[in-house]
Design a protein with these regions (language model features):
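Radical SAM/AdoMet-radical enzyme domain recognition
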Residues: 12-32, 38-134
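General structural signal for secondary-structure boundaries
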Residues: 7-12, 69-71, 83-85, 105, ...
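Short, contiguous strand/loop micro-motifs
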Residues: 5, 32-33
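Short, flexible coil/linker segments at or flanking structured domains
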Residues: 3, 18, 158-160
């Protein structure tokens, strides 16, 4: 999510409510906010995934690189070891003109992880799309603006009778709200919320499934 610091950690009790409904996540993204500020939450979240046997193929962790502690490194490693595939797993640095320069010592710490990708989040926004929200509304028209609202695709697997949700970046906020995309700012949450972790996923996506079948 975009916007100013919110000074709040992920509420694990909110996440736990929805995990029994999930059997597999193809690509799990841990972002924020800033995940390096709460390695204990990362560890406890992993314990919940283990408790409910939620399979994860890949994990993608995005950090600003300002505070790389041994606890954060260990939490990243634990998540990497938990994943089944790891073909796309990575820890990436937010490196662009809008972020402060990252200390080289912190970069070296991250390089100790084999799945560290030091170029994946290096973006020249003069050549790439920006989101027309928040401070980006004030950028000049030389920058390309990207539409970001995406309609998810959902279907029922006939053999397993399970709900499959694809073609979207389904996101859970720190407060337990479920969004169809995480590329928004905090102030936009109410406008893009499709439910919360108290809801049943099948009920949230019933209309989409009915439209397809």
């Amino acid at each position: 999510m975009r916007g100013d610091a919110q000074n709040i950690d992920l509420q694990l009790d909110k996440v736990e409510k929805i995990l029994p409904q999930i059997s597999n996540i193809c690509d799990l993204v841990l972002t924020g906010g800033e995940p390096s500020m709460a390695p204990n939450v990362m560890h406890e979240l992993l314990q919940l995934f283990q408790k409910y046997r939620v399979n994860v193929n890949n994990v993608y962790i995005v950090t600003n690189g300002k505070d790389i502690t041994p606890e954060f490194i260990m939490a990243c490693l634990e998540w990497y070891l938990y994943c089944d595939d790891n073909e796309l797993s990575a820890i990436a640095l937010s490196q662009d003109e809008f972020h402060d320069e990252i200390e080289q010592t912190n970069i070296e710490k991250l390089k100790a992880l084999s799945f560290f990708n030091d170029t994946d989040k290096t973006v020249d926004f003069r050549k790439s799309y920006v989101l027309n929200i928040g401070r980006a509304k004030k950028l000049n028209n030389q920058r390309k603006q990207q539409p970001i609202r995406v309609q998810p695709t959902a279907y029922i697997n006939e053999s397993s009778n399970e709900l499959n949700i694809v073609d979207c970046n389904l996101a859970i906020t720190v407060n337990g709200d479920i969004l169809s995309d995480a590329d928004y700012e905090y102030t936009e949450t109410d406008n893009i919320k499709i439910g919360d972790t108290n809801d049943k996923l099948e009920e949230l996506f019933t209309d989409i499934v009915d439209d397809i079948y």
